[in-house]
Amino acid sequence: MNINLQFHSTGKRTELNFDETDKIELIKNSIRIMEGINPQEQKLIFDGKVLKDTSTLKSCGIKDGSTISVLFEKSSNFLK
């Protein structure tokens, strides 16, 4: 199924293909490859809820054509 990722920091929107049984951590790893942002620094939000890494797309209610908001959180390493 096709999932839309909306990057709030840049306004960029990307469509990727995943299976309903894929976990949120797979999406975060895909974002790491595309954007170079570590999964620990990513926050994915759907339907007003922060998505847990171990949840599947299906268990989060994500369907074909859904949009997931992507936020980046700076880790404490950036403050040093």
From Swiss-Prot:
Protein name: Ubiquitin-like protein NEDD8-like protein 2
Residues that span the membrane, as ranges: none
A single Gene Ontology CC term: cytoplasm
UniProt signal peptide: none
Originating gene: nedd8l2
Domain of life: Eukaryota
InterPro entries: Ubiquitin-like_dom (IPR000626), Ubiquitin-like_domsf (IPR029071), Ubiquitin_dom (IPR019956), Ubiquitin_ubiquitin-like (IPR050158)
GO MF term list: protein tag activity; ubiquitin protein ligase binding
GO biological process entries: modification-dependent protein catabolic process; protein ubiquitination
PANTHER family tied to this protein: UBIQUITIN (PTHR10666)
Family: Belongs to the ubiquitin family.
Organism in which the protein naturally occurs: Dictyostelium discoideum
